[in-house]
Amino acid sequence: MTSPVRILFVDDEERILRSLALQFRRQYEVITESDPLRALERLKEESVQIIVSDQRMPRMSGAELLARSREVAPECLRILLTGYSDLDAAVEALNNGGIFRYLTKPWDPQEMAFTLRQAAEIAERQASAPVTAATSDLAAPLNLLLLDDDPETLHCVEAFCQAGGHRLMRAHNLSEALVTLNLEPVDLLVSDLKLGGEDMAPLLKSLAQAHPRLLSLVVTPFRDTQALLKLINEAQIFRYLPKPIRRGLFEKGLKAAAEQAFLWRSRPLDLVPRAAEVPKEAGENQRVGSILGMLARLRERMIA
């Protein structure tokens, strides 16, 4: 990529835009907009690699803007910046906007700089990648691993796999999941946050680092904003869906995940637009490291 990465910052507060432009104008080509509608027009007219939007704006929420920007510029990496812990906004930004990161105000300058550098590196790789011919396995059935004992979830996933000719695998605890993930290629993961009394979040975060192509859909009755934000940033989950299952919404999420999985099959791994954040909490980081180690050791034993 010969020209600098272009970043569009959108916020209704001009002082915020000035601060962001001042911080990043030396590394990137920075453009700013205080009007989300005008921001959408610029995305249609100009090449933009990264968009960073505030959530609470008078004319349109940041989550809605990022969802609409996805339709206009699907390859643009999307980041939500907000001073409020809003579960519904986070869910909308993830499920409809496909956000790369969720950052909070006041932002940490180093965290913001690191996040933008990760996004810019992905954008640069995408821009410089040669066009490659499709390979024969692009339409091969997907492998789906279910980590959920709920009968309704199982019924919906079984119907989806039967309709699409996909392969369904199940695990009933973390140990079974680790064995399956080492034995079998997995494209889609459907998981509750609790399985057999065990917390599945560390596994999801480990897989984001070990298997970037794997798409995770979380289906859970829990409504914890902070937990969701960590899953967005540290596990790069694809969807966050509520229980009890809303069949239409769940089926829509599965279909979108399958379409994304087929798309990513056609790309080299370094062009998959994912870069999971390392867990900030020491205990969680240790658990993730332990699972990554178990994945590696299992793989080594199976190869030997």
Across the structure, where does each feature detected by a protein language model lie?
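Alpha4 helix (beta4-alpha4-beta5 surface) of REC/receiver domains from two-component response regulators
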Residues: E64, S85-Y102, A201-P202, R223-Y240
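CheY-like receiver
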Residues: E121-T153, A261-A304
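Acidic catalytic/metal-coordinating carboxylates
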Residues: S34-D35, S61-E64, N173, D199-P202
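Receiver (REC) domain active-site loop signature in two-component systems and cognate sites
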Residues: M57, L195
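Acidic, metal-coordinating helix/loop segments flanking the phosphotransfer/catalytic sites
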Residues: T32-I50, R170-L188, D192
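Hydrophobic/aromatic residues positioned on beta-strands within the core alpha/beta folds
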Residues: L81-T82, V219-T220
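Two-component/phosphorelay signaling modules centered on CheY-like receiver
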Residues: T2-V5, E14-T32, L37, P151-M169, ...
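C-terminal output helix
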Residues: W107-L116, I245-L254, A258, S266
